[in-house]
From Swiss-Prot:
Endonuclease that specifically degrades the RNA of RNA-DNA hybrids. Its cofactor is Mn(2+); Mg(2+). Keywords: Cytoplasm, Endonuclease, Hydrolase, Manganese, Metal-binding, Nuclease. It is found in: Cytoplasm. Manganese or magnesium. Binds 1 divalent metal ion per monomer in the absence of substrate. May bind a second metal ion after substrate binding. Belongs to the RNase HII family. GO terms for molecular function: manganese ion binding; RNA binding; RNA-DNA hybrid ribonuclease activity. A divalent metal cation binds at residues 81-82, 173. It is an enzyme of class 3 (hydrolase). It comes from the Bacteria. Residues 75-260 form the RNase H type-2 domain. This is Ribonuclease HII. Its EC number is 3.1.26.4.
Length: 260
């Protein structure tokens, strides 16, 4: 205890960082140090541990579907999701991801709930950890030809067919696919399955990069910012510069604009 009281605040912080359990008896020694800096460090570390425990619990819950399949001896489970159904421009992108058994990637969630600043890091972690990743892309011409729902299915099937090894079971975000693979359709799957969440972030980052490239090719529509969605800035670009080759002509207001 004497050595703790004699330690600098920096040294105390380093020792606190080692603690992982709120019931660790070493907390008592630190709490006897009345220095304001030490007490602040204790509160900060306790808060961090609580956040870590909450994240661990969240990830465990996200593995519920996967764990029920593991219990049946099924290990090659692919999460499948898409991004880009609603935009006025650009492709629909689907991803299929097989994660290792009981894999946990901190911060992984429905891509819409992940801060944009963290997208790239979590995407990189998924790509590093995954057993297999497949990506399917259907452009605006396919979307206009078969409709967005069917194009989404085609993108998902393409993503799954690119997986090596092939999955034994599919966990899909609110979709049923005509494939000879056992599958489970999950409403709001990207918020309820870790495998689907992994597919969600892969599809999101892949599509965002494509839209950023399209901004270079078609400036004036802010594609890197709006990802092709019908924002005020995007619609203003259409008014000024017209419809581009990547706009979906079966979507309003594009459909009405090209009829004028």
């Amino acid at each position: 205890m004497g050595s703790i009281l004699m330690a600098t605040i920096k040294e105390v912080k380093e020792q606190l960082a080692i603690l992982r359990d709120l019931d660790d008896p070493r907390w008592a020694s630190f709490e006897e140090d009345s220095r304001t800096g030490v007490q602040a460090a204790i509160r900060k570390r306790r808060k961090a541990i609580l956040a870590e425990l909450a994240e661990e619990e969240r990830l465990e819950i996200l593995l519920n579907y996967e764990k029920s399949l593991y219990a049946r001896g099924i290990e090659l489970i692919a999460g499948v999701d898409e991004v880009g159904r609603g935009p006025l421009a650009g492709p629909v992108v689907a991803a299929a991801v097989i994660l290792p058994k009981l894999c946990k990637i901190k911060g992984l969630n429905d891509s819409k709930k992940i801060p944009k600043s963290k997208h790239e890091a979590i995407y990189n972690q998924v790509m590093k950890e995954a057993v297999a990743v497949g990506i399917g892309i259907k452009d605006n011409y396919v979307i206009d030809d078969v409709n967005i729902y069917e194009a989404t299915k085609l993108a998902m099937i393409e993503a799954i067919e690119k997986l090596n090894p092939q999955p034994e079971h599919l966990l899909i975000d609110a979709m049923n696919l005509d494939l000879p693979i056992e599958q489970t359709s999950i409403i709001k799957g990207d918020a309820n399955s870790l495998s689907i969440a992994a597919a969600s972030i892969v599809a999101k980052v892949t599509r965002d990069k494509m839209m950023a490239d399209y901004e270079q090719e078609f400036p004036g529509y802010a594609f890197a910012k709006n990802a092709g969605y019908g924002t005020k800035e995007h619609l203003s670009g259409i008014d000024k510069f017209g419809v581009t080759p990547i706009h979906r002509r079966s979507f309003e207001p594009i459909k009405s604009i090209i009829k004028k």
